[in-house]
Amino acid sequence: MAVKIRLKRMGAKKSPFYRVVVADSRSPRDGRFIEEIGTYNPVAQPAEVKIDEEAALKWLGNGAKPSDTVRNLFSSQGIMEKFHLSKQGK
């Protein structure tokens, strides 16, 4: 099963709110997911990002591929750097 870490759109029309979820790559964007690991609110100034770092690192270690936007969010939170350092430490 190919697993992706991606955004699931929530919220009202013209007022998006996203959940960062781990899902099978074949499931629809807003469909079934395996685990919710955070939230992202781009409407707030500045944008609110809350991610469970431990869960994100666990899924990245298990081979889950983040989408481009999620990769940028992880980089801004310092999660990608920690993941790369842990891979080099092996």
Curated annotation (Swiss-Prot):
What GO CC terms are in its UniProt record? cytoplasm; small ribosomal subunit
Domain of life, per lineage: Bacteria
Q: Which family does it belong to?
A: Belongs to the bacterial ribosomal protein bS16 family.
Which keywords does UniProt give here? Ribonucleoprotein, Ribosomal protein
PANTHER family, per the entry: 30S RIBOSOMAL PROTEIN S16 (PTHR12919), SMALL RIBOSOMAL SUBUNIT PROTEIN BS16M (PTHR12919:SF20)
Q: Which organism is it from?
A: Bacillus cytotoxicus (strain DSM 22905 / CIP 110041 / 391-98 / NVH 391-98)
Q: Name one Pfam family in it.
A: Ribosomal_S16
Q: Output one GO MF annotation.
A: structural constituent of ribosome
Name of protein: Small ribosomal subunit protein bS16
- GO aspect biological process, one term: translation
